[in-house]
């Protein structure tokens, strides 16, 4: 019996397509370059020096994905902003500790590589890196036949930043009397999408149906805000005690992560109005108030704790940086209670 001569391409892996992708994204990657980066794409590992301005540099690392927001993006053939979400989820986690993002790597996996789709995704990643002054130094594109349904892909991101040891923000300085400032979100960001998709399903609503004049898809696929530049500027001009990034777990789980055990955050619900998308979700899904605050950011991307004396400066800095910022609450003694977040 004569066996047909086989190639890797016959097995479903097209090396030439991978090389074509690299060529397409080179210009986008180059725009993210920082002076600390040594060399370019194509090495076995990416090289990056530490910025010389740091006396005791501490590296801060993080990894994340975009959850099932990716499912919605794939279903709607909207690939150009999901990469921004990927970067945002990583760099926002770094900056809350006072860290400046240095470099980013991505992992893109699919059953059959579509160069047009992949390049669109990676252009979005490069866009996010530019917004956060973070170098896209490399990544992995894995073409794995039989592992994914046709048209599907998965994403993960990895980021490393640096902070001066004496300037790490870890919540240890939070004290009774501190003021809480909110930074507005662009929408659900990259959390709660399994529930969002369930609400769409049970309500019989289509993503292209309109909400306040624009398709629901635009509300739900709005890219996650990247707060790096505004928060780093704030840290330079104000005494920041803690920053919480409101991701999975919402208010109830993320704010306590940055609080000492003997205090609580008291949130004034009347200080802001939920975005239309959150009102729609609560109504169409019959979702309880508690569940909304546990699953979604409800219009608040970050919560910052700082002394009352710095509130005016902080609001000015954040507003000038383009943020929607407002006083959302205060820090009080925990007392006899056990809940570290109260929403009144």
UniProtKB/Swiss-Prot annotation:
GO terms for biological process: 'de novo' IMP biosynthetic process; adenine biosynthetic process. One of its GO terms (molecular function) is phosphoribosylformylglycinamidine cyclo-ligase activity. It catalyses: 2-formamido-N(1)-(5-O-phospho-beta-D-ribosyl)acetamidine + ATP = 5-amino-1-(5-phospho-beta-D-ribosyl)imidazole + ADP + phosphate + H(+). It comes from Glaesserella parasuis serovar 5 (strain SH0165) (Haemophilus parasuis). It is an enzyme of class 6 (ligase). The keyword Ligase applies. This is Phosphoribosylformylglycinamidine cyclo-ligase. Pathway: Purine metabolism; IMP biosynthesis via de novo pathway; 5-amino-1-(5-phospho-D-ribosyl)imidazole from N(2)-formyl-N(1)-(5-phospho-D-ribosyl)glycinamide: step 2/2. Keywords: ATP-binding, Cytoplasm, Ligase, Nucleotide-binding, Purine biosynthesis. InterPro entries: PurM-like_C_dom, PurM-like_C_sf, PurM-like_N, PurM-like_N_sf, PurM_cligase. Its main location: cytoplasm. The gene is purM. Belongs to the AIR synthase family. The keyword Ligase applies. It is found in: Cytoplasm. Pfam families: AIRS, AIRS_C. It comes from the Bacteria. Transmembrane segments: none annotated.
